[in-house]
Amino acid sequence: MESTFIILTQIITFGTAWSMFHCLLKRKKKDWFSLVGALGYLLLPYHVYVVTESVDRSQILIWMVVPILAASLVKMSDTEKMFWKTGYGLTAVLALGIIGRLDGVAALTLLFLICVGGICRRQWQYPVIGILGVAMAYPTYMLSLIHIS
């Protein structure tokens, strides 16, 4: 059962990483570079450590959701139509909310990076998306604090 979970998550992670690199690259041969980028993403040392040592399933899921967050932010800043901007923004909020529910430190780190990226790219939507995503995960931590005390 454990190996089936790992194989399934790695297939999905490959798909999300390929999609992320496909959104990031603006070259003629972006399919080839997306394939190489996705394989590189799967072979990052910490990713390999998380998968092979089965540190925590939540860490495996975070590695699966981060490319969705990155692709959503890039597509949102590239598109002109408000309908698509809203859809990509909501996808990014949902992805960051999922990451926040899995690991609060990772969500706060990504919130910081999203805010810095928004300042550098002059995209006011980025900090708003980051704050909404972290706020979506906030009730999880409030409930855990109530149960502790």
What is each of the regions a protein language model found here?
Residues 1-149:
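Membrane-embedded transmembrane-helix bundle of lipid-linked glycan/lipid transferases
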